[in-house]
């Protein structure tokens, strides 16, 4: 009997304490399954966006049994030492459960603080997202459109100014070509005038030579006239001397009139001839001199006209040269201005393209930042849902533990062998068999990467 009592005692102890963790685990699984409205548990992963779904397949009610071993002696009571051991074990379990409850409460408080901080961050991110969506893009778009309109207006103005400058440049080029043609004509006329002037100078030189020749001839004739006058006077003197020295004595009254008349005739003839020669010489000299003077005056007039034309042509050439230099300076200034306009246009175009690229990069950065905020918001929502589910699960676990702790202990002193035998018969029904399916889904950016399913039997 003592051996049977010991066997019953060990069976009761094993059924009371060794099966307890299994029953508690079963109860926790039941609460876990009932905690989620869909019958699933969402377990978040810290390394990646990972969501696990735990779906119970079959669950049957678990009966709380404190004893399943038969009692040999139905009329005798249980040993009170067993009750003391159970009470001490119960106190230890209560202490452990109290510590576990404190730890769970601390974890729950930490989770609630984390949820509050995440909700505040979520609100801040939502406000920032609304601000970025509502204000920043529209402001950037308006600034972009306004600056683009200003740049287009500047481009149109620069294009119009460039066209005007090109037209002015073409007109100046045409004027310059005309002036060059006119200058060429003037140069040709100048060369012709210089050739005519050279010919006139040759004529003037010839006229001067002819005048000098005539002057020499006039001087020669004048010398010849003077010589003839001297010779005539000497002949007259000789004749007078011969007449005085004559041996013939003739009467002066008879002979003198004849000689005087002859001398007078000779003198008159000689005077006539001399006067005639002088007159002819003077007329010839005057005519030659008049011709030479006329020719010289004509040559002088032609030379003066040629000089005037030459001076006029020189002044025209100088004025045209000055005008060409001025046009060249204007053309160079316009070319520099056009180059400056083109450089400024290219620089403004480059700045506009840089601004457009910067705005596009900023818009792309804002879009990426919005996408990142949305992803963070989605992840935070997922974490919040997981935390809500876990908090609900812990709440259900706490309620279940409180209900289990508040349940009254069975009176071992009044247990009979029949009760023990009655409780031992449905032992197979008390062993709960449960299949748990753990479905793990990995997501990244809202897309499903992988999905795994694991089955566990209890």
Curated annotation (Swiss-Prot):
Gene3D superfamilies: 1.20.5.170, Single helix bin, Vasodilator-stimulated phosphoprotein. The keyword Translocase does not apply. InterPro entries: IF_conserved, IF_rod_dom, Intermed_filament_DNA-bd, Intermediate_filament, Keratin_I. SUPFAM superfamilies: Intermediate filament protein, coiled coil region. It comes from the Eukaryota. GO terms for molecular function: structural constituent of cytoskeleton. It holds the Pfam family Filament. Residues 406-458 are annotated as: Tail. Residues 1-100 are annotated as: Head. Disulfide bonds: none annotated. Signal peptide: none annotated. GO terms for cellular component: cytoplasm; intermediate filament. Residues 97-405 form the IF rod domain. One of its GO terms (biological process) is intermediate filament organization. Keywords: Coiled coil, Intermediate filament. Belongs to the intermediate filament family. This is Type III intermediate filament. It comes from Tetronarce californica (Pacific electric ray).
